[in-house]
Regions:
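Multi-pass alpha-helical membrane architecture of UbiA-family
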Residues: 1-185
Length: 185
């Protein structure tokens, strides 16, 4: 397919190709931040538990992987809802990089938010009610932060700080729930 065929197909359908939507979605969920947080979660798990479990056993723990994937989905949902509430401001401040309306619709983003929230919450509940409840509170906190807190001077910074630490607290809570050993501080 030549570039002119690609342009004709794009203009004829008035819809961007699916891979363009996928790239826009990856940009919207800030995949590089999610990758950084997941790496931090794995490293903190290994070093938090180093006195109680061999590193290989920590890495082999399927529940750790489920929790990290659940947290990653919830973080991506948080980025989507944050971008949704920032839509009007982004159109004014930097319209050339706004993906809503041009590449992906607001409805698609809301549907993606609900999907990511559902997957993250479902995986969290599989790990136990305490982790499920904590991660549900975390995802609610992300929504409250995006919708209300971010504009407020002191509560916005405090909320962002708490939400930054919350995924690591979820990992700690998971291991306190499933191990007979206390986690060293």
């Amino acid at each position: 397919m030549s570039s002119t065929d690609f342009k004709e197909q794009f203009l004829k359908n008035n819809q961007p190709p699916i891979f363009v939507k996928l790239l826009a979605m990856l940009s919207l969920v800030r995949w590089y931040n999610v990758l950084l947080v997941t790496t931090g979660l794995y490293l903190s798990s290994i070093f938090m538990l180093q006195d109680h479990m061999p590193k290989v056993d920590v890495i082999k723990d399927i529940s750790l992987h489920i929790n990290v994937v659940a947290i990653a989905f919830l973080i991506m949902a948080g980025y989507i809802i944050n971008a949704f509430y920032d839509f009007e401001k982004d159109l004014i401040n930097h319209p050339e990089s706004t993906v809503f309306g041009t590449v992906i619709s607001k409805q698609f983003c809301l549907n993606s938010y609900i999907f990511f929230l559902f997957v993250g919450s479902s995986l969290s509940i599989l790990l136990g009610w305490k982790v499920g409840l904590f991660n549900l509170l975390f995802s609610s906190g992300l929504w409250i932060y995006s919708h209300k807190l971010r504009q407020k001077p002191l509560s916005g910074e405090l909320g962002a700080s708490i939400l930054t630490v919350a995924p690591f607290a979820s990992i700690s809570l998971h291991y306190m729930q499933h191990l007979q050993y206390p986690i060293r501080g």
